[in-house]
Amino acid sequence: MSDERRSSARWPVAVTVKVTLQNGHAFDSNILNVNLGGCFLGEVAGLREMDVVLLHSYYNPKLNGIYAQVIWVVEEPGLRGVGVRFQPMDDAQKFELVRWFNQVVGR
């Protein structure tokens, strides 16, 4: 793991999200840890570094459409998934992300 991936504190969570690919295909995944810059999506296969996905959270408050780019891929026994970085967003999306983040990490 690079230092860049571990430079910010992460909070363990178990939040279901809908992941939509650029081709429109969608599936559910679980966020295993999160910070305000990105998250780790568990049990995701077939994505490559630099792919962009759209995330929607079912958790209340809902997270309505945050774009994220795959930064790293893990395919090891016992752990498979992708680390994603949230893409630039407008002020309303930032507010929504912070509100959602505070709820899911219990702050």
Describe each region flagged by the PLM.
Residues 40-43, 76-86:
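Short, solvent-exposed secondary-structure boundary/capping segments
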Residues 29-30, 65-72:
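Short beta-strand-centered aromatic/proline hotspots
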Residues 15-21, 50-63:
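Short conserved beta-strand and strand-loop elements enriched in small hydrophobics
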Residues 89-94:
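Short, charged/polar, Gly/Pro-enriched secondary-structure boundary elements
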Residues 22, 36-37, 73-78:
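Short, conserved beta-turn/loop elements at beta-strand boundaries and strand-helix junctions
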Residues 8, 42-48:
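Short, surface-exposed secondary-structure edge patches
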